[in-house]
Amino acid sequence: MSARLIYVMDPMCSWCWGFAPVADALVQQARAADVPLHLVMGGLRSEASPLEPSKRRYILEHWQAVEEATGQLFLREGALPEGFVYDTTPACLAVTAARSLEPERAWELVKLIQQAFYGQGRDVTRPSVLAELAEQAGFSRQQFADAFDSPEQQAATAADFTWSQDLGIAGFPTLLAERNGQLALLTNGYQPLSELSPLLGRWLERAASA
């Protein structure tokens, strides 16, 4: 029997940050049942131009709404500074690079990127920042940098984006449970742990007895 928890997300997605404590608890619940996590990057934004002031205001208002809905704190003061290009591709590439090196440890990097961006206001579109965070997560800085710069991981990141699009996933966070190639949707969008933990628990019980 082959089973895994698939989390389709983007490290720079505000709802994924709001969902972070729930996701972490579910990952631990699955791992306790020997079901590993597989991360798929969704590719939220690939902007090429700096944010317009009106767009920045809109995003910060959205962050406030997510904070109110989930209880996750966002650092809004000084966030998204003038000239910031909201391109999530480098952060996604960082996770696929980490996944290629140590799949289980990639989750630690996701959490560090989210905390750096939403909790500390750091520019996680910069490769140097991502390399620093990867080192904090326990990766060799040089090995990470080599993977980050490799055509193979650029292709893997693009393949993640395509996979989620082909599956019809229109929003993040999306959590799937896979058993023997069959996918079950746990959630598309934020839900509290009180709703999702029993749902995952029932799926894990069925997976264990399959």
Question: What positions do the PLM features span?
Answer:
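Alpha-helical structural elements
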Residues: S2, D10-M12, Y58
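Structural alpha/beta surface segment adjacent to cysteine/selenocysteine redox centers
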Residues: A20-G121, R126
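Short, low-complexity intrinsically disordered segments
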Residues: C13-W15, E61, R105, G201
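Extreme N-terminal starter segment of soluble prokaryotic enzymes
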Residues: M1-I6, V35
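C-terminal cap of thioredoxin/glutaredoxin-like
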Residues: V8-M12, F19-Q29, L112-A210
